C-alpha cells in the first residue's frame, strides 16, 4: 500500500510512532548501553517529543478543515526544522577538532538550576560539554547525523500531511 495515499490520520499517527520509536531507542541506549546524553542530545529529544505530540494531536483531532490541516503541517514542519538546526549544530561540533572549541563544562541539570532558560539554551548551543564525542555509529553515521536525517524526514512528512491535495469526488458520476 502506498503511504502517500494514506489518510491524514494514518500519516499523522505514523509520524507519532516514528517519534516514539526514536525516543524509545534513545532511552534504551541511555539505560541499557550506558550512553549518557549530552545537552544537545537532550534538546534533540525534546524536539522529537514535541514533534510526536504535534503528530498525535493532529492525528487524533483529524480535522477535515483544510486550513487546520495546513496549520498542523506548518507547526510540524517548523518544529522539525528547529530540531534539524539543533542536530546540525551537534554534527558541526562533532566534526570540529576537539581543541578548537571551548567546553561548556557543566551538565544540563546544573545549568538549568543556575541560569534562566534562554541563557541555558545559549550556553548549550555555544559550548560542547561532551557533545563532541562520537560514542555510537550506525552505517558510518553518528547519532546526531541520524537525528538530522529523521528531523528532515519528519519535516517532509509534516509538509505532506498538511499540504497534500485531497482527492475530490466528481460532481456527477
Swiss-Prot record:
Family matches, as Gene3D superfamilies: DsbB-like (1.20.1550.10)
Cytoplasmic side: 1-11, 64-70, 165-173
GO biological process: protein folding
Ranges annotated as spanning the membrane: 12-28, 47-63, 71-88, 146-164
Membrane disposition: Multi-pass membrane protein
UniProt GO cellular component terms: plasma membrane
PANTHER family given in the database record: DISULFIDE BOND FORMATION PROTEIN B
Protein name: Disulfide bond formation protein B
Gene: dsbB
